[in-house]
Amino acid sequence: MRRITRIFVHCTASWQETTTMESLRREFMDKGWKAPGYHYVVFPDGKVFKMLEEGLVANGVKDYNSNSIHVAWVGGIKYDVKRRLIPVDNRTDEQKVALFDLLTKLKIRYRGAMILGHRDISPDLNHNGVIDPWERIKQCPCFDAYEEYADINKIG
């Protein structure tokens, strides 16, 4: 039995209209990974799909996977005015509700775990105790998961 200490929130950095479970599985297989990057995926309609059993290790955050559960929402990208891909919090209302419900259930199951965004493990380069935007290795999940789920993190 794995000891879960972190629940990471991700975005898939993919298009909400065209992403499927099969396209996500194919993406991870094409990377040569033995396991997908997420345990759960939340689609724009709020439906939650299990991609990997919780007892198995996903490839969500390098060096943090053995003791983590990974949850992703589909989306997180758009084009800017110059047609460059940029990160965006484009979660639907249904995704927000489904994420909150799923994360609450996971936090109750793994009471000692902390809910974080993928970006929250970036190094604090200026040692001010905060991961500033310029320090982030990734923008994922495109919003402040630690702040948004602070009340859930109090469970435990």
Functional labels for PLM-detected ranges:
Residues 23-25, 40, 56-58, 64, ...:
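Generic preference for flexible, low-structure residues
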Residues 1, 58-66, 72:
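Short glycine/proline-enriched loop/turn "hinge" motifs that connect secondary-structure elements
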Residues 48-62, 124-137:
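Charged, often glycine-rich, active-site loop that binds/positions anionic groups
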Residues 19-21, 52-54, 60-61, 83-85, ...:
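Generic alpha-helix signal with a bias toward terminal, lower-confidence helices
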Residues 1-8, 12, 67, 76-156:
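Basic/polar, cationic surfaces and motifs that engage anionic cell-wall
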